[in-house]
Amino acid sequence: MNRILRTGIITLGLALFLSAFSASNAMAQASPVMRDILGRMDRYNKALTSFQSNVTMVKWDSLLNANDTYEGTASYLPKSSKNPMAVRIDWSKPAVEQMAVRGDQYELYRPRLNQVIKGKTNSAKSNGAAGGALAFMSMSKAQLQANYTVRYIGQEAISGGTQTWHLELTPKTPTSYKTAEIWVDSDGLPRQAKVTEKNNDTTTVLLQNVRTNVTLNASIFKLDYPKNAKIVNG
């Protein structure tokens, strides 16, 4: 799977985590602090109709001890009775690329190559690091509870100074990654996420300038590219 597509899917996993997680998942065994955090997340999710944000993504290669940094914007519409879930990511650095996911279909447009990669998200699940992030996408609340152990790590300030609660999600069954971590703000929004793969490579996603419940035209989730673009099945 294309490297940018993998990184885009990590962001997608974070966004879809918002619609998959519920306070009820862990209330039975939660501490008072966890109950508060999960309750805030649950209320945020129920009130969320859309969001847009700036995205910074850092991929760290543990073998080379080197980072690759990506910057762009994300738009998100949760699943409704009338429409499937929709996510769009527009990368501006280091290269201009656009990714859109609507329901179980994704498209990745690479202008510099005049190429469009198309496929289904479920077929992407088996592709390396993408699998772990995409797991968030299709999990029901019951599946999330069954597959992850949630641990409260503590309070931390993330880049920009935002105060957050730091949670660690450890898969109960083998996956392509070891752990996922999220940093939840006072509104109940995961502002940062980190996935650590089995080889200790990490991908960290930071959301900034978040605008919630904005008016989004569904047409933005359909990529606009030249008719002569080369189509590649992902």
What would you call each of these model-derived segments?
Residues 1-6:
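Positively charged n-region of N-terminal signal peptides that target proteins for export
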Residues 114, 120-162:
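Flexible, surface-exposed loop/linker segments and immediately adjacent secondary-structure boundaries
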Residues 57, 109-112, 194-198:
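Beta-turn initiation residues at beta-strand->coil junctions
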Residues 117-119, 149-234:
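Gly/Pro-enriched, hydrophobic low-complexity segments
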Residues 74-132, 203-204:
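An acidic-aromatic
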Residues 24-70, 77-82, 225-234:
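N-terminal leader/targeting segments and the immediate start of mature chains
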